[in-house]
Amino acid sequence: MSEATTTLDGWYCLHDLRSIDWAAWKTLSSDERGQAVSEFLNVVEKWNEVATAKKGSHAMYTVVGQKADIMLMILRPTMEELNEIETELNKTTLAEYMVPAYSYVSVVELSNYLPADEDPYQNPQILARLYPELPKANHICFYPMDKRRQGDDNWYMLPMEERKKMMYSHSKIGRQYAGKVRQVISGSVGFDDFEWGVTLFADDVLQFKKLIYEMRFDEVSARYGEFGTFFVGNILPDEKVEKFLHI
């Protein structure tokens, strides 16, 4: 049997994507819509306070295309907190005019290839990646993915050293985009329908296409990668939420 990779796990992660029922939203009076927006922003302010205390992080983006209208990415220390956040949001008036479009549950993950005598949880660089402050980049790209398990192309039957070698080659491509694309990898085996979630942040949206296309030619993606639905969007600052929902 092949050896399993040891992972380092950080904050739990929820991607919550929703569509707005614009027709129903229009039936509210201007005052009613204003109250609903204020209530929602009060919830977001609680998230901001958590982020300031460095006990979690979040990101809010509008989604381009018909798959959804808004994407929320929430990071918290426990799965229970993610559930509480989702429930609190569902109890708001605004949620009555939202339709669930997609969700993904995972945990921020790194593969542990450090020497056995080194404690990764004492390494500041690793801690910053396991418990990240999500960037306020202009754009986001999220997609889930699996490693293929078919016939001779079975990632999980490969020896550990071969997997390490291929992942090192794969990661070199990503490092070429340092400063252009920020990446958060989250593991979801046993949590959701795919094995990983990949979230990319960039100020130049074209960098998503360039990075993902270049990685397609690497063996890890070309031979072993299987991908789910892609979602891409634009940042939605708190101060622009009212304008986004204005009728």
Curated annotation (Swiss-Prot):
EC number of this enzyme: 1.3.98.5
Cofactor(s) this protein cannot do without: Fe-coproporphyrin III
SUPFAM superfamilies: Dimeric alpha+beta barrel
Keywords, comma-separated and alphabetical: Heme, Heme biosynthesis, Iron, Metal-binding, Oxidoreductase
Annotated S-S bridges: none
Xref: Pfam families: Chlor_dismutase
Active-site residues from the entry: Y143
The protein's annotated pathway: Porphyrin-containing compound metabolism; protoheme biosynthesis
Enzyme class (EC, first level): oxidoreductase
Family annotation (Gene3D superfamilies): Apc35880, domain 1
Catalysed reactions, as listed in the record: Fe-coproporphyrin III + 2 H2O2 + 2 H(+) = heme b + 2 CO2 + 4 H2O; Fe-coproporphyrin III + H2O2 + H(+) = harderoheme III + CO2 + 2 H2O; harderoheme III + H2O2 + H(+) = heme b + CO2 + 2 H2O
Record has Lyase as a keyword: no
Top-level taxon of the source organism: Bacteria
Comment on bound cofactor: Fe-coproporphyrin III acts both as a substrate and a redox cofactor.
Residues at which Fe-coproporphyrin III binds: R129, Y143, P144, M145, D146, K147, H170, Q183, S221
GO biological process: heme B biosynthetic process
GO terms of molecular function: heme binding; metal ion binding; oxidoreductase activity, acting on the CH-CH group of donors, oxygen as acceptor; peroxidase activity
NCBIfam families: PRK12276.1
Family of the protein in this entry: Belongs to the ChdC family. Type 1 subfamily.
Purpose: Involved in coproporphyrin-dependent heme b biosynthesis. Catalyzes the decarboxylation of Fe-coproporphyrin III (coproheme) to heme b (protoheme IX), the last step of the pathway. The reaction occurs in a stepwise manner with a three-propionate intermediate.
Designated name of the protein: Coproheme decarboxylase
